[in-house]
């Protein structure tokens, strides 16, 4: 591993007091630990046609998408009063490809859960994922809110105050493309192109649309991953029950998400639940920052039909 690292470009996050060194592998930035997991997944993971991949860049709605998808596919076994989501962090319910290849394989033997989560760019997914023709769901979000969410998540993870970790520096990292699994625009573009080529295999979900029109988008999600709601379920309010159970307000209020850490984990569960709001960036961005990031996103996403403002 050390020999591989020596050949890769490096970036040190100065705003985190040099506590993170990122390496550029296959045109995206990642940590040493996640690179090790990425290499293992690329070399050994065998996808199945029945798999459903939940794909995202960090801090774009991953936790929410996982919760909704898990509740949808397990609703025959659990309801809003018995779901494992009420007792475990959602990331313990849906395995993460870059860390849990063996657990994913074990799940196939012990349960029928088809869900796998990943932050990998489309071009860096294991070849078996593309070859298997399995379905993927990609969630994306306004980059300005992504920057703010990422800032607070990492700042609190490393126990730094806002004075110790200037927001201006994390903004510059993102603007220059030096973010985890970034550049962010490249991450979006990779999945966007693939979704246009294979619309029946890749569902594009916008975080803000999921917030503003949850019922129609949760129905869309369920149909796409092969677990559509029946007319009886719709009449019985099953969709609304799932939305309420998986809401930020509900999950963030659970004791498990206030005080605990996942088994073997270092981060407190509460770090995954900060605000769950749109537009918090307005409390952090200067006009100059807004203009800079809007300009580069307009340039990068030109012609894609995507709007992230």
UniProtKB/Swiss-Prot annotation:
Binding site for 3'-phosphoadenylyl sulfate: 59-64, 141, 149, 207, 274-276
Main localisation: cytoplasm
Protein localization: Cytoplasm
Enzyme class: transferase
Catalytic center residues: 119
Enzyme Commission number: 2.8.2.-
GO MF terms, alphabetically ordered: sulfotransferase activity
Keywords for this protein: Cytoplasm, Transferase
Gene Ontology cellular component list: cytoplasm
Keyword Cytoplasm listed: yes
PANTHER family per record: SULFOTRANSFERASE SULT
Family designation: Belongs to the sulfotransferase 1 family.
The name this protein goes by in its record: Flavonol sulfotransferase-like
Source species: Flaveria bidentis
């Amino acid at each position: 591993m050390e020999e591989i690292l020596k050949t890769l470009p490096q970036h040190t996050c100065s705003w985190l007091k040099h506590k993170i060194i990122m390496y550029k592998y296959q045109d995206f930035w990642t940590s040493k630990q996640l690179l090790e997991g990425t290499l293992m997944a690329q070399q050994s993971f065998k996808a199945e046609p029945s798999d459903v991949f939940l794909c995202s860049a960090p801090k774009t709605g991953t936790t929410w998408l996982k919760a909704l998808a898990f509740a949808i596919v397990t609703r025959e076994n659990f309801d809003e009063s018995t779901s494992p989501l009420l007792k475990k962090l959602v990331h313990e319910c849906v395995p993460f490809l870059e860390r849990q290849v063996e657990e994913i394989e074990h799940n196939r033997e012990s349960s029928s859960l088809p869900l796998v989560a990943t932050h990998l760019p489309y071009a860096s997914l294991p070849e078996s994922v593309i070859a298997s023709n399995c379905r993927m769901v990609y969630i994306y979000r306004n980059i300005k809110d992504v920057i703010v969410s990422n800032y607070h998540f990492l700042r609190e993870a490393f126990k730094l105050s806002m004075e110790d970790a200037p927001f201006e520096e994390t903004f510059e990292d993102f603007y220059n493309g030096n973010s985890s699994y970034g550049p962010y625009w490249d991450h979006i573009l990779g999945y966007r192109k693939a979704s246009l080529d294979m619309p029946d295999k890749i569902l594009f979900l916008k975080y803000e649309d999921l917030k503003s029109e949850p019922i129609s988008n949760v129905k869309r999600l369920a149909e796409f991953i092969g677990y559509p709601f029946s007319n009886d379920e719709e009449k019985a309010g099953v969709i609304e029950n799932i939305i309420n159970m998986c809401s930020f307000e509900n999950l963030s209020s659970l004791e498990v998400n206030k005080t605990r850490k996942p088994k073997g984990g270092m981060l407190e569960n509460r770090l995954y639940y900060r605000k769950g709001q749109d537009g918090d960036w307005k409390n952090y961005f200067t006009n100059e920052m807004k203009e800079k990031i809007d300009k580069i996103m307009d340039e990068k996403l030109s012609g894609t039909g995507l709007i992230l403002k």
